[in-house]
Amino acid sequence: MPLLNTITTPYAEAFLQVAESKKEVEKIIAQAKSILQLWDESSELREAMGSPVLEVESKKAALEKIFSGKVTPSFLNFMKLLAERQRIGFLNSVLERLLELYRAQRNIALATVTSATPLNEDQQAALLKNVQSVAGTNNLELNLKVDPDLIGGFVVRVGSKVIDASLSGQVRRMGLELAKVT
C-alpha cells in the first residue's frame, strides 16, 4: 500500500462509518465532490490549509467560516479533526479515498470522460449508455473533464480500459502508422 494510502485510508474509512451511522452517506459523498472541486480550484485554500506557519486554531476557524452551514456538522467536524491532527493538507487525498471506498462498497465503476468541449445533457446521456455497455455495468459514475488539446472528440477511461475517440488521438495513431511504413 502506498504511503499516502496508509495516511488517508484510516481517515476515509472512519468518516464513511460516521456517515453511515448518521445515515448521511449520500449527502456526505455529494459534499465531498463539491469540496474536492473547490480544493482543486482554490490554490489559496490549499496553500493556507497546508501552511505550517498557520496555527491549527486559525485553520479550524477558517474552516468554520468557509464551510459552516454549507456542509453537515459531521463533515465540518471531520475537517477540523484533520486540522488538529496536522492532516488537513491531505484533505483532497482523504476525500478521493473516501469516494473510492464508497464506489467499491456499492460496486460503482468510475468512468472519466475527457472531451474537447463541454458535453450537453443529451450528449452525456448518450455517452453514459455507450460507456455502460463497454464497462459491462449500469452502475457507473461519470467524471467529466474538458481538455481543448484533444481538438475534437473524447477519451473515456474505465478502470484499465481506455477508449480514445479524440482527434488528437487519431492524428497520433496515424503518425505511428506512417512511421511504421517508412
From Swiss-Prot:
Keywords recorded for this protein, A-Z: ATP synthesis, CF(1), Hydrogen ion transport, Ion transport, Membrane, Thylakoid, Transport
One GO MF term: proton-transporting ATP synthase activity, rotational mechanism
Its membrane topology: Peripheral membrane protein
Compartment list: Cellular thylakoid membrane
Principal place of residence: membrane
Pfam families: OSCP
InterPro entries: ATP_synth_OSCP/delta_N_sf, ATPase_OSCP/d_CS, ATPase_OSCP/dsu
The organism's place on the tree of life at top rank: Bacteria
Entry keyword Ion transport: yes
GO CC terms, sorted: plasma membrane-derived thylakoid membrane; proton-transporting ATP synthase complex
Assembly and interaction partners: F-type ATPases have 2 components, F(1) - the catalytic core - and F(0) - the membrane proton channel. F(1) has five subunits: alpha(3), beta(3), gamma(1), delta(1), epsilon(1). CF(0) has four main subunits: a(1), b(1), b'(1) and c(10-14). The alpha and beta chains form an alternating ring which encloses part of the gamma chain. F(1) is attached to F(0) by a central stalk formed by the gamma and epsilon chains, while a peripheral stalk is formed by the delta, b and b' chains.
Family: Belongs to the ATPase delta chain family.
Function: F(1)F(0) ATP synthase produces ATP from ADP in the presence of a proton or sodium gradient. F-type ATPases consist of two structural domains, F(1) containing the extramembraneous catalytic core and F(0) containing the membrane proton channel, linked together by a central stalk and a peripheral stalk. During catalysis, ATP synthesis in the catalytic domain of F(1) is coupled via a rotary mechanism of the central stalk subunits to proton translocation. This protein is part of the stalk that links CF(0) to CF(1). It either transmits conformational changes from CF(0) to CF(1) or is implicated in proton conduction.
UniProt name for this protein: ATP synthase subunit delta
UniProt organism field: Prochlorococcus marinus (strain MIT 9211)
Gene behind this protein: atpH
